C-alpha cells in the first residue's frame, strides 16, 4: 500500500515517464547480478543461487552480525593507549550524532523494549570507559539491542518495497492505456487486467518463494528478540569497565553461537533451500507459460 501511494504521488507530481523509467531501471539493477551469473549458469540455478544467499543471509546473518560488538569493545580499549586515535574517533562520532538520535527515537516507537532499556540506570561513573567515546553507555546498549534486528527487518522491507513497486507499476500502467481507449470504465478494466496478469506472473513460483522469505525473516527476528530481551532483562552492558563489558558480550556471543549451531536453524535452512529450488524451477519453466496463457485468455475476453 505504501509503495502504491508513493507511486501515485510520483505520477501526480512529475510526468509518468521518469517514474516508470526509475522503476524499470531499479528492477534492471536488481536483476543485473542474476543476468550476469546466468551467462555462466543455467537461469534456474542462477535464480536459486541468489534467492538462497538472500534467505541464508536473512536467517543466519542475524546471528552473526552481533559479533561486531567484540570489535566495538576492542576499539574502545585501544583508545586508552592511542590519544590521537581517540580524538579522531570522537570527532568522527560527532558527525553521526543526529542520525543516531533519529534512529533511536524512531526505533523506540517500534519496539517497546527500547523504552524499557532507556528507562534503566544508564549512568556513568567518572573515569569510565565511556569517557573515551562521544556516544554514551545508553547509546552503546541501544546499538547492541538493535543490531540483531537489522538484517531481517531490512530484508523484509526491501522485498516488500520491490514487490509493491512492481505491483504499482503493473496497476497504473495497465489502467492508463485502457483509460485512453474507452474512458473512465477503462480504469476498472485496466486494473483488473493488470492484477490478473501480475498474479499469473508472480503466484506460480511466488506462492512458494514469498513464504520462504517471510520464514527466513521470522527466524532472524525471533533470534533478535531473544538476544535483545536478554540485554534488557539481565541489564547487560551496563558496566563502566572493559572487563565487565567483555564478560557480558561473551555471554551474548554464546547466545548467538547457540543459535547459529542449532539443529533447528539448519533444518529450517535445508527445507527452505529445497523449496527455493522448486520455486526456481517453476519460475523458469512454468511461470512464463502461465503468464502468457493468462494474457492471451484476457485478450480474447476483451476482444
Q: What spans do the regions from the language model cover?
A:
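Transmembrane alpha-helix/helix-exit interface in multi-pass inner-membrane proteins
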Residues: 59-123, 142-180, 210, 214
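Alpha-helical transmembrane segments and their helix-start/interface "positive-inside/aromatic belt" motifs
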Residues: 1-4, 47, 51-52, 141-153, ...
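Hydrophobic alpha-helical transmembrane segments and adjacent short intramembrane/lumenal linkers
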Residues: 164-278
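Intrinsically disordered, low-complexity acidic Ser/Thr-rich regulatory segments
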Residues: 109-154, 186-196, 201, 248-259
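Interfacial/capping segments of alpha-helical transmembrane domains
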Residues: 7-29, 73-80, 290-294
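Juxtamembrane boundary at the C-terminal end of a transmembrane helix
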Residues: 281-303
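Interfacial helix-start motif at the membrane-water boundary
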Residues: 30-58
